[in-house]
Design a protein with these regions (language model features):
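Catalytic pocket-lining loop regions of alpha/beta-barrel enzymes
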Residues: 1-101
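Mid-to-C-terminal alpha-helical segments outside catalytic/metal-binding sites
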Residues: 96-100, 106-152
């Protein structure tokens, strides 16, 4: 959970942990993690808007380290997908094996304004370059990473 000013600060130094523990899988999440898809991200801004400048810390970590993944849950994951659709299409293609859908839905029916997950599913379906990539992000990557057996 990367959230500037609160949890796991110094995201720019996270690569040291990834190098030190190459056999441990890490799942990045939250406002600072997803804000840093943008190379010019201002760390104090929790939900940045507008076009993404390529080359952000998160993009580099996902590209360079096989033991890091990205959890798209909550408003921060949703914001990272919706703020620049052109960037998102390429990001989903580049990191199709490293991204994990998470609902962060805190209601019992799985819909409505409090359920960010329903909106995130819609964005993944809309912006994934292919059905294969969509399936990976929505469930196949998590199943593989967490070593879950498919249901019969």
């Amino acid at each position: 959970h990367f959230q500037h000013g609160k949890y796991n600060q110094k995201i720019h130094q996270f690569h040291r942990i990834l190098k030190k523990y190459p056999k441990v899988n890490f799942i990045g999440h939250a406002q600072t993690w997803w804000g840093n898809i943008d190379r010019n991200h201002q760390q104090a801004v929790m939900y940045p808007k507008g076009k993404v400048t390529p080359g952000g810390i998160t993009d580099r970590l996902l590209s360079e380290y096989p033991n890091v993944y990205g959890d798209l849950s909550a408003g921060s994951g949703n914001n990272s997908l919706s703020r620049d659709e052109e960037h998102t299409r390429g990001f989903l293609a580049r990191h199709q094996n490293k991204l994990l859908f998470g609902s962060d839905c805190n209601d019992t029916v799985g819909s409505g304004p409090r359920c960010v997950g329903a909106r995130t599913i819609g964005l993944i379906r809309k912006l994934s370059p292919s059905k294969s990539i969509e399936r990976k992000i929505l469930y196949e990557n998590a199943r593989q990473l967490l070593k879950l057996n498919p249901t019969s």
